[in-house]
Amino acid sequence: MLNLLQGCKDFLHLTLSNPEHLDPIAPQPLYGHTLVSLWDTGVLVFEPVDGNSHKDIVLSSGVHGNETAPIELCNGLIQDVLEGRLQVKERVLFLIGNPAAINNGTRIVDENMNRLFSGEHSRGPGLSNPERVRAKKLETYVTRFFEKGAEKGEGRQRIHYDLHTAIRGSKHEKFAIYPYRPGRAFSGEQIMFLAASGVDTVLFHHEPTTTFSYFSSELFRADAFTIELGKVYPMGQNDMSKFANTREMFKRLICAEPLELAPFDETQVNLYQVCRVINKEVDDFEFTFSTDVENFSAFPRGHVIARQGGKDILVEQEAEAVVFPNAKVPVGQRTVIMLVPAVNPHVE
């Protein structure tokens, strides 16, 4: 496997050439200081040979197949490790989420994978399509990875950054969604790590979801985020210079280099609280704003933002901003997240 990986020098190419399955390969030494193992197609683990690490880090991309910049970003980091330019000093699990959709150049094959975690893949119709099957496998790999880390002792930090890009433009180009975590403070250190990575906007979610990051946060108490790194572009057409800060901070993280983070300062970041989500209840749901409205566009109290079933849907707060508006989702799914500025969030 090592010869195969180093020969092709492109883990993404290997994954996309085998979108459904790759036989697992046991850990093999790399340059005398790193162990590399393959668990499945798009599932690669690096860990230091000496076992001396303190963090278990999951970097996932490609859960949506047309969100290519994070895929290219992670593939570049993988390539640098395989070719000896980077030496990982923490345990790292790289996941390329949806190879079939990447090959298609589409967001999904049959269903939105990022609504299928925390067991949702097996509810309703069950494991009825490739996204549901893959989501279940990805849960298994994350579980295995974090549980193997726990064997190395208590006090290890668990991290999961699920990387995406957005369909539409945004008033804040890069932003992160902090999953709902009742009874746990939000991490100021993590927020400032994101800021140093160029992600200066954070949304605090208000309820459980079935996203990949919520799965890791809830089940393993990981510092987990859904991170949006800009706008969707076709593979090979991303300006990777826009991700220089993100790449640098990820490199420091997996190589256990000093992060040099500023103390938490809410004036240096944009913090939003999710105040509600609006679900599609009937087929005639429609927004009143244009299809190219940017994420974080705000509307005043009383403004009609959508209609469905002959009823107007109004802005309820003094002002509410929209994120991820999509009127074309199936009935029963979320059409938009509504935001207000976060007031005194519990950050430690």
Curated annotation (Swiss-Prot):
Q: What Gene3D superfamilies does the record tag this protein with?
A: Zn peptidases (3.40.630.10)
Q: What is its EC number?
A: 3.5.1.96
Presence of the UniProt keyword Coiled coil in the record: no
Keywords tagged on the record = Arginine metabolism, Hydrolase, Metal-binding, Zinc
Report which superkingdom the organism of origin falls in: Bacteria
Q: How is the cofactor bound?
A: Binds 1 zinc ion per subunit.
Its pathway, per UniProt, is: Amino-acid degradation; L-arginine degradation via AST pathway; L-glutamate and succinate from L-arginine: step 5/5
Positions annotated to bind Zn(2+): 64, 67, 164
Active site per the UniProt annotation: 228
Q: Which cofactor does it need?
A: Zn(2+)
The chemistry this enzyme catalyses reads: N-succinyl-L-glutamate + H2O = L-glutamate + succinate
InterPro entries associated with the record? AspA/AstE_fam, AstE_AspA_cat, Aste_AspA_hybrid_dom, SuccinylGlu_desuccinylase
What is a GO molecular function of this protein?
Answer: zinc ion binding
GO BP term, example: arginine catabolic process to glutamate
- Protein family membership: Belongs to the AspA/AstE family. Succinylglutamate desuccinylase subfamily.
Q: Which PANTHER family match?
A: ASPARTOACYLASE, SUCCINYLGLUTAMATE DESUCCINYLASE
This molecule's function is given as: Transforms N(2)-succinylglutamate into succinate and glutamate.
- What name appears for this protein in its UniProt entry? Succinylglutamate desuccinylase
Q: Which organism is it from?
A: Shewanella amazonensis (strain ATCC BAA-1098 / SB2B)
Q: Which gene encodes it?
A: astE
